Amino acid sequence: MSYVLNWDALVDEAVRRRKTEGLTQVQLAALAGVSAPTIISFEKGDKGLSLSKAIDILAALGLTEKNSSQTAQENFVSDAFERWLKLVEALPQDHPSRFPHGFVAYDYEIEGKIPSITLSEFRTNILEKAVAPFSGWPPFWLPTRDGLRPYVVDDVVECWIGDPATNRAFTDAAHADFWRVSREGRAYLQRGFQEDSEDLPKPGTIFDLTLPIWRASEVLLHADALASALKVDSSAAINFHVKYTGLSSRQLTNWAKPDRLPFFDTHRSRTNDVALSVRASVGKVRENIASLILELLQPLYEKFDFFRLSESLVQEETRQLISNARKL
């Protein structure tokens, strides 16, 4: 037996219940923890609305029970991934912007009291200040060109640099970033692997030794910079998460730095997805970056036939990264 959800009837019942309970759309938005425009879109029957936001609205009206096991950050990440899926759904399966060989997704939440700020102030005074040039392609970069620059979706600042309809200098998966940042100190970044460049003969077959250290460090330092720009309390913390997909059958190499630690044995992953996390104190990230990254990434490297990520390697790479920022 199969069941079909009558979405229109559910929306109608939600509107009826809101009016019966004497709630305005703004009041319902506050109860559900969503924006007023989201309520308006929901009541118009917009099927493009994320499922988690629809559930928030229905739960506020007593029409469904929200899964209490999922945290606010997990909801934020789910919404972000759903948005990305919607953006790429019309693209061919092998299009680089779909990350056909896998991707890495970073997300973080700043745990602490965050002051109220307008979206315009958030973009200009916070997001722009948080971008640090540790490399030529910094995370959460804010393009200014039409078609690439950030925009607002459901009170969240969003940017998709992988839009094939826009003329871009780089069209590979590693330069097709999708990111979202909220004024509540939540962020999500999804990016393809540089190792899957179209210039290489076999995308999806190698995993670089040093690139994960640089990329994770950049995003963690961005979280600390965002917290600083938001002027959060010094007792605040950053909960940082990374998920790698498409790792199965990849071989660990020194592709980005051929002179770094030559491999005499084959180190291959039989695991496809790896999820990692670390917790850091706001204002202490830069001074502890090597130890934080070692704690975060060691379980990832172990999936490649028990490869041991050495403390000295992480210290040297993070030292170079910090030094690189001073030169750029």
Label every PLM stretch briefly.
Residues 33-49:
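Recognition helix of helix-turn-helix/homeodomain-like DNA-binding domains
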Residues 70-328:
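Bergerat-fold GHKL/Histidine-kinase-like ATPase
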Residues 8, 19-20, 48:
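Short amphipathic helical patch at the helix-1/turn junction of helix-turn-helix
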Residues 12-29, 56:
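Short basic helix-loop element that most often maps to the first helix and adjoining turn
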Residues 1-9:
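A detector for short, charged/polar N-terminal pre-domain segments
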Residues 52-68:
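DNA major-groove recognition helix of helix-turn-helix/homeodomain DNA-binding modules
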